[in-house]
């Protein structure tokens, strides 16, 4: 099977959709290829919570947040730890913070994408500065609605006749002629039929490598030490680096594959759609983070919302490479969340009253769903029973009751002294987080763990989970893929 088009776009996530939308609007014929099924148009973004980083938006100004491209860039460069040789990562950082409001925020608003009224304040920074102000803008309806809106505008475009879509098509090879990329070749996976595309231009929008756990391990960042025995898969199942290999074979420079944004609080999905399928929890700030023995990780306690990269590093330094979080039902109802569209149905379906109810009264549906189905979560009425069930889960009696009791009772004792005497870094960070309204709504006010009125007790076994690739094909600011000498691949 042969195709001829002006531009072939490989990958129908939001990058591929946006590219195709802009191209047909300029009168170009486009063939949009994707390996997945048509109902999954939108890729991993369709499964995501839908957060996008912006600096200097009208939404921020409405809430009195004084932000700017200059401040955003300063935070980005500090947190990103860019080195002197990172020319293109720095150039892209500068370009994004300068243009993101006009070219992304405003562009999305023009396409009827709405954002929640209050930005979230994540990655505030721990050892180095992070986001100085709240910048995480959440799409109202999660990434599911973001993908649906963009796909709807693409498929309903006045120039729709210029677009051809093909799903179930796996691209294996980029074609060249006289030193120039001229198209691609692959297989229709359902039938085994080969196809070939000839195009004036080719766009790779196929995602990163984090859907292939072997590649994740092979490109593990040195800050994290050795990869843990279990790494759950939280990326797209087809984000496997296949197109990285194809591009590399025609001379593309592939860089910074160790720059991955993975998460520390993954649990196993009980309805897996891929090998090792994991869910990325939003770890409760009021929960105690324990190691595999049940000892509180420290001396610096682990608290989410400040430095995800450091959380992963701390977990990987533990002997067994996984952790526990200790909490109770009251904390779980207010703070426990799963990142993504699947387990935020009220938010995904834009049900305002249910979202408000969950914020005010706690998300009972999610609590029941997780505790009833997730094998990595155990619940008990007393601490001895809880530790017994933790040990039943791991199967070797490695969780020490005395260690868990010591961690919980000492933490509760510090809470009992009152806020003026909170000499515990976790409590200080909870207090700071609650100053921002968006976090105050989702964070308990110094909740004890062993409070009998807040039970039952809950323990969550958490694994590192793969998510986002920050490296890949090196490009200039015109998105032209560069070769090893820094020249555009023709």
What are these regions (language model features)?
Residues 193, 197-271, 479:
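Glycine-rich loop(s) and the adjacent beta-strand/alpha-helix scaffold that form part
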Residues 2-5, 191-201, 488:
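Core beta-strand elements of the Rossmann-like FAD/NAD(P) dinucleotide-binding domain
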Residues 25-46:
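Glycine-rich FAD pyrophosphate-binding loop
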Residues 244-246, 253-399:
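An anion/pyrophosphate-binding glycine-rich loop and adjacent beta-alpha core
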Residues 46-75:
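N-terminal glycine-rich dinucleotide-binding loop that anchors FAD/FMN and/or NAD(P) in oxidoreductases
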Residues 66-129, 382-413:
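Rossmann-like flavin
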Residues 7-32:
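N-terminal Rossmann-like FAD-binding beta1-loop-alpha1 element of flavoenzymes
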Residues 41, 93-195, 213-216, 267-268, ...:
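Conserved redox-cofactor binding core of oxidoreductases
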